[in-house]
From Swiss-Prot:
UniProt PTM: Phosphorylated by HPr (PtsH) and EII-Glc (PtsG). HPr phosphorylates the PRD 2 domain which has a slight stimulatory effect on GlcT activity, while EII-Glc phosphorylates the PRD 1 domain which inactivates GlcT. The phosphorylation is dependent on the presence or absence of glucose which acts as an inducer of the ptsGHI operon expression. In the presence of glucose the phosphoryl group is transferred from phosphorylated HPr to the sugar via EII-Glc. Under these conditions GlcT is not phosphorylated and binds to the RAT sequence, thus allowing transcription of the ptsGHI operon.
Lineage, uppermost ranks: Bacteria, Bacillati, Bacillota, Bacilli, Bacillales
Outcome of swapping residue 51 to T: Drastically reduced antiterminator activity
Name of the featured protein: PtsGHI operon antiterminator
Domain PRD: 69-174, 175-278
Outcome when changing residue 245 to P: Loss of ptsG expression
Task performed by this protein: Mediates the positive regulation of the glucose PTS operon (ptsGHI) by functioning as an antiterminator factor of transcription via its interaction with the RNA-antiterminator (RAT) sequence located upstream of the ptsG gene. The RNA-binding domain of GlcT directly binds to the RNA antiterminator (RAT) sequence and prevents transcriptional termination. GlcT binding requires two identical and nearly symmetrical triple base pairings in the RAT sequence.
Subunit-level organization: Homodimer. The monomeric form probably also exists but it would be inactive in RNA binding and antitermination.
Pfam family name, one: CAT_RBD
Impact upon substituting residue 9 to R: Drastically reduced antiterminator activity
Amino acid sequence: MNGSFTVKKVLNNNVLIASHHKYSEVVLIGKGIGFGKKQDDVIEDKGYDKMFILKDEKEQKQFKKLLDYVDEKLVDISNDVIYHISNRTNHSLNEHIHIALTDHIAFAIKRQQQGFDMKNPFLMETQSLYPEEYQIAKEVIDMINEKAGLCLPEGEIGFIALHIHSALTNRPLSEVNQHSQLMAQLVEVIEDSFQMKVNKESVNYLRLIRHIRFTIERIKKEEPTKEPEKLMLLLKNEYPLCYNTAWKLIKILQQTLKKPVHEAEAVYLTLHLYRLTNKIS
């Protein structure tokens, strides 16, 4: 980037808001960058460690408000964590992560200090759905624990993995959470239908979960799916429990996503359910 920045507001010793001729308002981060700075002071290009742009005025206000109750050390930890996520994924992140993840980390640390362990009922589903994000989230938890001298619970890995996935895909966190909850609901239906406890570490379970993940994406995009009619009839007759359960899952998907689902999806779900319940590799 070329050109200098003009200080608009110092948020703390390490974070300030500045204006730039090309990017309008930006947030600059750097050790001591805000110390002694006043409005309209000039900061030369490369006189900072990190920069991000909050284009939305609402998000700018949220970030400023966030820094009113989050101390500088935690902001530094959050910035280091986000920088690590960006490097590990080699992918641009939605800038909202600076607000959402910082806020989450602040409350996670507060809960830990108060001795409150927040359970994550969708941990296994999150790990199965987003394995890469989950691995990075584990690294993030290790960083936070080391820098803050804490031992955050395992469930936080799942929560942070969802924040990472949200930032990578530009999808609202509420939508990402909905998919994890939907997955857990579908697994309950499967266990109830087959009167079994699913082994969530089995290869066939992972295949099923990932298949459902991509099924959800196809449904949301309304992508057509080829319908193998002969195979559908065969599965319906040979494996009625698997086939009927597949349709139960499809009806839940239709109701939750409010989108039509092609009949062909029942075929592929039936095959995955058969493999899962018969432990076929």
